[in-house]
Amino acid sequence: EDLLNEADEAGVKVVLNATVCGMYQDKEITVRIGDEIHHFKGDSIIIATGAAENMVTFPGWTLPGVIGAGAAQTMMNLHGVKPGSRILMLGSGNVGLVVSYQLIQCGCEVVALVDAAPRIGGYGVHAAKVARTGVPFYLSHTIVTAEGDDHVTGVTIAEVDSSFKFIPGTEKHFDVDTKCF
């Protein structure tokens, strides 16, 4: 609400819950707001699409302690709460790398960073910061299962082939209380 007030005071028109259905030259757009169509033209136009986390499903993915990176950031940055003590991160893109580093700064132990891709997906500067803390990277690996009865107590990962199929005999287990992706 404070941000909306600041924008209003700066003369910015904010339109929420709207869909841009046309973009034209000279900074003009057509926007659907509810059942109405509106046309806007301005010196500057900012379109903020919002975001939704991609959920990867695997046995145990609905256990408490399996959380998205955005949820982990909200817990740390907004509520001042550690998402867990021992955390396995799935994803080596910029989000996974940055959130892993934030978790470490928050006092969490990131036991591993896992990605099915054969190469780190994020910027080298972010990967280097995480690597310097001693977090092992498991590339060409993915989650097999999250274990636990009423919350996550462990995660098993395995190496994957070029078709992203598990390679038998490559499983590794980690005792964790949180699995983040």
Where are each of the predicted segments found?
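FAD-binding core/adjacent interface of flavoenzyme oxidoreductases
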Residues: E1-R86, S163-D177
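A Rossmann-like FAD-binding core segment of flavoenzymes
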Residues: A7-V31, I104-F181
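Rossmann-like NAD(P)H-binding beta-loop-alpha module
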Residues: P64, Q73-R119
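Short, surface-exposed, charged/polar-biased interaction segments
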Residues: L63-V66, G93-G96, G124, A131-G134
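Generic serine detector
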Residues: S44, S85, S92, S100, ...
